[in-house]
């Protein structure tokens, strides 16, 4: 057999068997040449879908196993997770909730392996709208979210007993708020980037009040004391 014939045979073998090994393999019901009904679709990367098909798309209820070990079970529409579903991550984290076009969208609950627990609304895979976020150390935030961060009005209760209720921006205290310290004292006033910034009033345990202007948590200029009896 000459070199040219050997080359041709190799190319034919590669096209028939090499490419086939890189093509998803389907076993299941068909209609008009398309995947339709129930079946199993196995991909070369090890991922697999078992469930319902419609007009060649994953459509209906099914289970998709990712190459990294994550497993999604729930609704599909035109190949993408849609509607109610549950995503179990390989590390043990679990998301249960709504999907739209393959992304978390609508109400959902996400319990992470590290102990972070979120219940609330999502948009485009990010926390967006109203929600409750609880951290393993005991901190709890309830309020508005935007692009995965506290943004808008909310209240955070810390594990040490202190709390803050007011406005947030990009995950930090910004604008007017009330901070209640664990020792019983409180601050009412303006914040910027998690610090007292602007005019505010500190109320001490004995009822004495101190009002003044702050910058980066530090008093700027003079302030005014007001005793419990109003003097």
Region spans (language model):
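Bacterial N-terminal signal peptides that target proteins for export
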Residues: 1-8
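Bacterial N-terminal signal peptides
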Residues: 8-16
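Conserved anchor residues at repeat-unit boundaries in beta-strand-based tandem repeats, strongest
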Residues: 25-36, 48-59, 71-82, 94-105, ...
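Extracellular beta-strand solenoid repeats
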Residues: 40, 63, 86, 109, ...
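Polar, glycosylation-prone regions of secreted, cell-surface, and some intracellular proteins
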Residues: 31-34, 42, 48, 65, ...
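Intrinsically disordered/low-complexity terminal segments and short unstructured peptides
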Residues: 6, 22, 39-41, 62-64, ...
């Amino acid at each position: 057999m000459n070199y040219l014939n050997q080359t041709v045979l190799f190319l034919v073998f590669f096209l028939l068997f090499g490419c086939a090994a890189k093509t998803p393999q389907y076993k299941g019901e068909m209609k008009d040449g398309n995947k339709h009904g129930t079946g199993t679709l196995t991909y070369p990367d090890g991922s697999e879908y078992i469930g319902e098909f419609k007009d060649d798309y994953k459509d209906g209820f099914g289970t998709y196993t990712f190459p990294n070990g994550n497993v999604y079970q729930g609704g599909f529409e035109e190949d993408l997770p849609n509607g109610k579903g549950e995503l179990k991550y390989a590390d043990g984290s679990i998301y249960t909730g709504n999907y739209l076009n393959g992304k978390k969208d609508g109400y959902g609950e996400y319990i992470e392996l590290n102990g972070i627990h979120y219940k609330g609304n999502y948009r485009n895979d990010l926390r967006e709208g109203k929600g409750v976020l609880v951290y393993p150390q005991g901190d709890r935030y309830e309020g508005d979210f935007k692009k995965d961060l506290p943004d808008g009005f909310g209240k955070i209760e810390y594990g040490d007993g202190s709390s803050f209720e007011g406005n947030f921006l990009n995950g930090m205290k910004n604008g007017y708020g009330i901070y209640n310290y664990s020792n019983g004292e409180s601050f009412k006033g303006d914040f910027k980037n998690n610090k007292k910034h602007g005019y505010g009033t500190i109320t001490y345990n004995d009822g004495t009040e101190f009002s003044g202007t702050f910058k980066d948590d530090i008093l700027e200029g003079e302030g005014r004391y007001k005793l419990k009896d109003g003097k």
